[in-house]
Design a protein with these regions (language model features):
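Active-site loop ensemble at the mouth of alpha/beta enzyme cores that anchors a bound cofactor
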Residues: 262-364
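Active-site loop/helix belt of alpha/beta enzymes
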Residues: 162, 167, 177-310
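A charged N-terminal "starter" segment
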Residues: 1-134, 431-436
Length: 436
């Protein structure tokens, strides 16, 4: 619902949105958390997506403590929830800024009042540079740092900034890459650096180096480590090269770090950043605050195996300390076979690119009924989930199943509202999303 994307807390929500009870009078967003609804009590329209607010808060506290203990900063990636309220909550918890993936996402955050952004992506050519300039012309107090991996993009941005006098300063981050965008090697990065320095003005400046190690991952764990090590090494080694060209006093950023290999970023880049008093290391992890029952569950198990999650000199199990905060709730529509249930949830409602949803708990008649340890989703259609059941299962039509998900980034984008739950699963908040 695109009309929600510029909404305030006073926007009226109705049954056009997943979860909202059919026939209920429209409600302001901030009233939804006062109705006493529960996803399994029969009132809410299913499927819907929910956020365990306690788990989310715990994940935020844990990640902020981790970053602080390593002398780093974090600009959480807003592409995961695209919720301005949750982005503001992360800033209030100590985030240095916010990361976005494109110009539209930047517009969402700027309109919400945020001013320090990392645009962690290349944006295209001259037309895209003009679109970015058109946006930032409305926000003269913005601080935006953007990835660049070609002289063509540097030239396009330079031209756009030369043509207008009403733009805030633009910070350029030379991106090194492996597997996706980013300069391949020092020679390419030096050409980009020279193009930036030749065009510098007070409003158009080099502000650091960037990388994204997650794109370097492959199916082979050892090859993944080799590729990430190489990417971090070239990123780290380039910092003193910048200092030779620009001097020691200019503040610089070194930014990397998703939600799976951020421990390697800390381990490989911290020393170089610590040796530079005017430099700060900024992670961009976003999905970590939501965690999941799939790709990030596996990712944090890998982090633990590397012995990488250390806070204040102590090793903590990331796999147990972080808690999955997202659930999708769906009703059983059919029991056509003894070992099969069909549920009202499909590809339009839940992610499937990094694993299928996981049945967790069964509810019946508005109350907890049983854990679903042996049930498994094995296929999704547009609107249906195929759930394999154990022999003798008494899952019944009308039961509600609580599912864990895999990959928050491609699950949340299907939903206009994320329902915040308290520990007894009552809805106590509602968060608008702005996925366009």
């Amino acid at each position: 619902m695109s009309d929600l994307h510029t909404a305030t807390e006073n926007v009226l929500i109705d049954e056009r949105v997943r979860g909202f009870p059919p026939g209920n009078p429209p409600l302001p967003l901030d009233a939804i958390g006062k109705q006493g609804w529960k996803p399994y009590d029969g009132r809410m329209a299913l499927p819907l997506i929910s956020l365990d607010r306690q788990a989310f808060s715990g994940n935020v506290e844990l990640m902020m403590a981790y970053v602080k203990s390593h002398g780093a900063e974090i600009a959480p990636h807003a592409k995961t929830p695209m919720s301005t309220a949750l982005a503001e909550a992360l800033l209030a918890a100590g985030a240095w800024g916010t990361t976005v993936a494109d110009i539209r996402q930047a517009a969402v955050l700027l309109k919400a009042g945020q001013r320090r952004l990392i645009l962690a992506n290349e944006i295209g050519g001259a037309a895209a540079a003009c679109r970015l300039a058109a946006l930032l012309g409305h926000y003269p107090d913005a601080e935006l740092h953007i990835f660049v991996d070609s002289t063509a993009l540097v030239d396009a941005l330079r031209t756009a900034w030369q043509e207008r006098a009403d733009l805030p300063p633009l910070g350029l981050l030379v991106e090194f890459g492996a597997g996706r965008a980013g300069a391949r090697g020092v020679d390419a990065a030096e050409a980009i650096l020279e193009a930036i320095l030749a065009a510098e003005t007070p409003a158009f400046r080099l502000t650091g180096i960037a990388a994204y190690e997650g794109a370097a991952a492959t199916a082979d764990a050892q090859e993944t480590m080799r590729r990430i090590d190489a990417l971090m090494a070239v990123t780290s080694d380039f910092l003193p090269k910048l200092r030779v060209r620009i001097g020691d006093e200019r503040p610089l950023l070194v930014t990397a770090g998703g939600s799976v290999f951020f421990d390697l970023v800390i381990a490989r880049l911290s020393a170089a950043v610590a040796a530079d008093p005017a430099c700060r290391l900024v992670l961009r992890s976003g999905a970590i605050f939501f965690h999941d029952h799939g790709i990030y569950e596996r990712g944090l198990a890998g982090l633990d195996a590397r012995g990488g999650f250390r806070i204040g000199g102590e090793t903590v199990s990331a796999a147990t300390a972080f808690r999955p905060a997202l659930r999708v709730w769906a009703e059983v529509l059919s029991r056509p076979e003894a070992r099969l249930a069909i549920c009202g949830m499909g590809m339009r409602d839940v992610a499937m690119d990094q694993g299928l949803p996981r049945p967790l708990v069964l509810y019946r008649n508005g109350a907890y009924f049983a854990d679903l340890e042996s049930a498994e989703v094995f296929r999704l259609n547009d609107q249906h989930a195929f759930v394999a059941l154990a022999d003798g299962s008494d899952v019944a039509v009308g039961d509600v199943i609580e599912y864990g998900i895999s990959h928050p980034c491609t699950c949340l984008d299907r939903h206009a509202i994320l329902y915040g739950l308290d520990p007894d699963h009552s809805v106590t908040a509602a968060y608008l999303t702005s996925f366009g």
